[in-house]
């Protein structure tokens, strides 16, 4: 009994300690801002997880689109780099970082909910089903995907990607607004020049890819053409 109580107190003490700010560094850096940045780290890592899953899907022998696989592998790495940049930034400001689990199904469902919201600006994607994500996840996302031949092509994946990038961008814009409300000039500057600039560029590039794919006739040959062109994600801005 005493050992259990000691362990419980030790865990609670550890959690409390982990949430301490670094007083010698922290200045004009609020708890609510730190919490938002922690949440954004989770969202960046969730996006990375989705992209890694998509990369593995396009590497399958019955899909075999190496160019698109490479696109998603690089996109996954880019999102992880963004998460690391946020971690570095929190530490630079004297903040603290706690981590939560990442569930692929939950991550995909969050994007789906964003797409169907009034603020997404993606009315044409209201029937987004994230079928590839559901195919590679351990838990079923929905039962409305039908035959795999209907959604296994690259166009669907890039439409999913546009939704994900716009979701991440919306979260960054929300953090920027709250940072501005708190008069945190340093954070608003970092968000504008190192994160939002990159997101806008990525969204534009993905939109071009979708337009190009839609202009092709449906078929794996045209997906292969896009794969050979290889639409590389926008290079990471140095943080």
From Swiss-Prot:
Q: Indicate which residues the UniProt annotation says bind Fe cation 2.
A: 79, 165, 199
Question: Which reaction(s) does the protein catalyse, per the Swiss-Prot or TrEMBL entry?
Answer: 4 Fe(2+) + O2 + 4 H(+) = 4 Fe(3+) + 2 H2O
Q: What is its EC number?
A: 1.16.3.1
**Segments of this protein annotated with the region Insertion:** 105-146
Q: Name one GO biological process term.
A: iron ion transport
Q: Which family does it belong to?
A: Belongs to the ferritin family.
Instruction: Point out the signal peptide segment.
Output: 1-18
Job description of the protein = Stores iron in a soluble, non-toxic, readily available form. Important for iron homeostasis. Has ferroxidase activity. Iron is taken up in the ferrous form and deposited as ferric hydroxides after oxidation.
- Where does this one sit in the cell? Secreted
Subunit info here reads: Oligomer of 12 or 24 subunits. The functional molecule is roughly spherical and contains a central cavity into which the polymeric ferric iron core is deposited.
Q: Which UniProt keywords apply?
A: Iron, Iron storage, Metal-binding, Oxidoreductase, Secreted, Signal
Q: Which InterPro entries match?
A: Ferritin, Ferritin-like, Ferritin-like_diiron, Ferritin-like_SF, Ferritin_CS, Ferritin_DPS_dom
Pfam families per record? Ferritin
Naturally occurring in which organism (per UniProt): Lymnaea stagnalis
Q: Which residues bind Fe cation 1?
A: 44, 79
**What SUPFAM superfamilies does the database record attribute to this sequence?**
Ferritin-like
A cellular component term, taken from the record's GO annotations: cytoplasm
| Domain (Ferritin-like diiron) ranges | 27-217
Q: Name one GO molecular function term.
A: ferric iron binding
Q: CDD domains in the record, alphabetically? A: Euk_Ferritin
Tissue specificity is:
Midgut gland and bloodstream.
Comment, domains: Contains an 'insertion' sequence of 42 residues which is not present in other ferritins.
Protein known as: Yolk ferritin
């Amino acid at each position: 009994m005493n050992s259990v109580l000691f362990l419980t107190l030790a865990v609670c003490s550890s959690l409390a300690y982990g949430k301490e700010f670094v007083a010698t560094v922290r200045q004009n850096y609020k708890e609510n801002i730190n919490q938002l940045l922690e949440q954004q780290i989770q969202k960046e890592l969730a996006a990375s997880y989705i992209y890694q899953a998509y990369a593995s899907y396009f590497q399958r022998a019955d899909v075999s689109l190496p160019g698109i696989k490479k696109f998603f592998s690089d996109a996954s790495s880019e999102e992880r780099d963004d998460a690391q940049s946020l971690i570095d930034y929190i530490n630079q400001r004297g903040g603290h970082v706690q981590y939560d689990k990442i569930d692929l199904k939950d991550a995909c469902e969050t994007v789906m909910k964003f797409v169907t919201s009034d603020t997404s600006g993606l009315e044409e994607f209201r029937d987004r089903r994230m079928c590839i994500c559901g195919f590679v996840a351990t838990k079923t996302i929905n039962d409305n995907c039908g035959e795999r031949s209907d959604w296994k092509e690259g166009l669907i994946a890039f439409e999913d990607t546009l939704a994900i990038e716009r979701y991440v961008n919306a979260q960054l814009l929300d953090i920027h607004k709250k940072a501005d409300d708190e008069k945190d000039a340093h954070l608003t500057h970092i968000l504008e020049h190192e994160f939002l600039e990159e997101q806008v560029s990525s969204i534009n590039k993905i939109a071009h890819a979708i337009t190009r794919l839609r202009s092709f006739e449906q078929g794996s040959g045209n997906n292969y053409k896009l794969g050979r062109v290889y639409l590389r994600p926008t290079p990471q801005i140095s943080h």
